[in-house]
């Protein structure tokens, strides 16, 4: 029976991972976050009470709680991070302070107490790599100039990867995983009308629900390999289980190369699908696709990546894993999940 510490347990990955752990294993979850709305059903479920332990707190404040639970648990997942591009551009220091500085003591505690650290790197570390597939072992990590603060997230995560690798050279048991555009219900709030305040699928979905125009940044030609959250969690469960130590000292891309679509394609797919739902059809009819520049949308410090496809050979072979959810099913699952929230999202327009 493993004890799994999830910092950021109420976040997108955290709440989906907790649910899967409680449903399919006998492991205990010890979670901290500043809110508990996404995990309220887990906390209220009588059958999980003995295995779901939650503390409302902040990793930058409740440092003694964090260290105590790093010592107590077997596997440590520090999932607290800012991961929205508009924030990279507008508040780069805030991104660095949380994503790197606040997480560094947790990494050090995992090394000190001999725990398995499962750390979320990011597909962003590859930056503007020119490879057709990004290889965790061989691809170069290429970022833009200093006057483009959008790279602060990529650089903060890359630096942490290198620090963790350094601790690994001194005995830390670690696994780095790089999510490639994981999507699903609960990614961001659809109740956020401000452009750039959430990630692309949720942003577009909120616009469709409210009948607002969808803005394509620089024409929407940028492509992304989208990965359904359930597929990502499948891989994470295997990493945490770490059968025969297979995941120790490894870096895994977790993504779905077959779901590689442009942002313009994504907008079209979502509008077409919305027309099939009575709850969304009226809003979708009012949506126009308009073009904008990255400077107008994100700010002058933005720079984009045109293609981002993961090489997942080692992930599949070593973990016995493969992504199985295509793009159409991924989007339909998201549309189904949000049906009950349509009225709330529309109310933002009133």
Model-found features: residue ranges?
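Active-site "gating" loop of Rossmann-like NAD(P)-dependent oxidoreductase/epimerase domains
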Residues: 81-94, 101, 112-115, 120-153, ...
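A conserved pocket-lining segment of Rossmann-fold NAD(P)-dependent short-chain dehydrogenase/reductase
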Residues: 88, 143-148, 174, 180-193, ...
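N-terminal Rossmann/SDR dinucleotide-binding element
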Residues: 1-75
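NAD(P)H-binding glycine-rich loop region in Rossmannoid oxidoreductase-like domains
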Residues: 59-98
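SDR active-site strand-loop-helix element
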Residues: 7, 32, 76-79, 117-123, ...
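Active-site Tyr-X1-5-Lys
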Residues: 147-175, 205-210
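C-terminal substrate-binding subdomain of Rossmann-fold SDR/epimerase-dehydratase oxidoreductases
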Residues: 208-350
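Conserved cofactor-binding/catalytic machinery of classical short-chain dehydrogenase/reductase
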Residues: 61, 102-105, 116, 124, ...
């Amino acid at each position: 029976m493993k004890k799994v510490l999830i910092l950021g347990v109420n976040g997108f990955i955290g709440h989906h991972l907790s649910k899967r752990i409680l449903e399919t294993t006998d492991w205990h979850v010890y979670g901290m976050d500043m809110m508990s709305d996404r995990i309220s059903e887990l906390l209220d479920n009588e059958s999980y009470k003995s295995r779901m332990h939650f503390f409302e707190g902040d990793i930058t404040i409740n440092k003694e709680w964090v260290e105590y639970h790093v010592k107590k648990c077997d596997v440590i997942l520090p999932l607290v991070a800012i991961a929205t591009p508009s924030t990279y551009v507008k508040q780069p220091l805030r991104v660095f302070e949380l994503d790197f500085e606040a997480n560094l003591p947790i990494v050090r505690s995992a090394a000190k107490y001999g725990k398995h650290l499962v750390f979320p790197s990011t597909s962003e570390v590859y930056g503007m790599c020119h490879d057709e597939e990004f290889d965790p072992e061989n691809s170069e990590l290429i970022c833009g100039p200093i006057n483009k603060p959008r790279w602060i997230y990529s650089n903060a995560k890359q630096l942490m990867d290198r620090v963790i690798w350094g601790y690994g050279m001194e005995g830390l048991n670690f696994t780095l995983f790089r999510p490639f555009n994981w999507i699903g219900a609960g990614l961001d709030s659809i109740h956020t009308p401000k452009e750039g305040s959430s990630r692309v699928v949720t942003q577009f979905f909120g616009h469709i629900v409210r009948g607002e125009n969808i803005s394509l940044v620089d024409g929407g030609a940028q492509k992304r390999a989208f990965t359904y959250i359930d597929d990502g969690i499948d891989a994470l469960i295997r990493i945490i289980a770490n059968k025969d130590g297979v995941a120790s000292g490894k870096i895994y891309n977790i993504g779905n190369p077959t779901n590689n679509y442009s942002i313009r394609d994504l907008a079209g797919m979502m509008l077409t699908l919305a027309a099939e739902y009575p709850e969304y059809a009226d809003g979708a009819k009012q949506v126009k696709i308009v073009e904008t520049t990255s400077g107008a949308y994100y700010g002058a410090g933005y720079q984009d990546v045109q293609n981002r496809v993961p090489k997942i050979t080692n992930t599949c072979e070593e973990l016995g894993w493969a992504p199985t959810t295509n793009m159409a099913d991924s989007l339909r699952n998201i549309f189904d999940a949000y049906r009950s929230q349509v009225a709330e999202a529309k109310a933002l327009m009133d």
